Amino acid sequence: MIIARTVRELQEAKKELNGSIGFVPTMGALHQGHLSLIQQAKKENDHLIVSIFVNPTQFLEGEDLNAYPRREEADRKICEVAGVDIVFMPEIGQMYEKDELCIGAPAIRGYILEGEKRPGHFDGMLQVVMKLLNLSSATRAYFGKKDAQQLSLITQMVKNYFMDVQIIPCEIIRDEYGLALSSRNVYLNEEEKHRALALSRSLKRATKMVMQGELDVEAIKKEMMQVLSETDRVEYIAIVDRQFKALEKVQIGNTIILVAAWIGKPRLIDNIWI
């Protein structure tokens, strides 16, 4: 396994790769959710590149970039055991120049839900993902459905900019109790982990209602809010179609139900596709 810390080192390492390239971009602090992406990419491609880069431009004022969990040695071992060919671990100066051109999230889809609560977050995310996709020369890039709005925007970016890469959505990985895996879960104590299960329980409640014939969005949200009373603060419940347009009625096969809530220190998100 090659560790590339500069763009030049990555470009040199890629010269040894022949065939399809799978790419998994991460911010490190790898967990089983990341590993599932890596394993799928390994299975479906001749070669595999993983990036580990805590991107400063997607952190907002007041969000502590320096507090984001970093476990470089552990992450490297996970990648090595998983059979990754190249791990790209650049410093900030490798990824950004002063006064560079920027791309931005679309005015509507990029500034609702996560984009409304964290304005500018998706601008920074799309900027770095475009750079990483170009640098990796990926045939396929793998993203989890847990960040559903991010996945939607990346897919749109690739289409709008005619980028020659296939975006592969991957299922949400949960722990044995149903909590969606996240690097931010390390901030939860045992009591908070138990309360955090309210997110997945609220989504299960919504799914059960839909399966029983209840399609009214407001009725479903009301039931979900009751389940989410165990959280410290609910930031949003949203029921949208795959293009992130708000719905009045659930459309089977074209609906995403999303929730964001605070539990102790971290802000957690979860969703289900119906």
UniProtKB/Swiss-Prot annotation:
Pathway: Cofactor biosynthesis; (R)-pantothenate biosynthesis; (R)-pantothenate from (R)-pantoate and beta-alanine: step 1/1. The active site is at residue 34. It is found in: Cytoplasm. Its EC number is 6.3.2.1. (R)-pantoate binds at residues 58, 150. CDD domains: PanC. The keyword rRNA-binding does not apply. It catalyses: (R)-pantoate + beta-alanine + ATP = (R)-pantothenate + AMP + diphosphate + H(+). GO terms for cellular component: cytosol. Beta-alanine binds at residue 58. GO terms for molecular function: ATP binding; pantoate-beta-alanine ligase activity. It is an enzyme of class 6 (ligase). ATP binds at residues 27-34, 144-147, 173, 181-184. PANTHER family: CYTIDYLATE KINASE/PANTOATE-BETA-ALANINE LIGASE, PANTOATE--BETA-ALANINE LIGASE. Homodimer. The reaction proceeds by a bi uni uni bi ping pong mechanism. HAMAP family: PanC. Belongs to the pantothenate synthetase family. Catalyzes the condensation of pantoate with beta-alanine in an ATP-dependent reaction via a pantoyl-adenylate intermediate. NCBIfam families: cyt_tran_rel, panC. This is Pantothenate synthetase. The gene is panC.
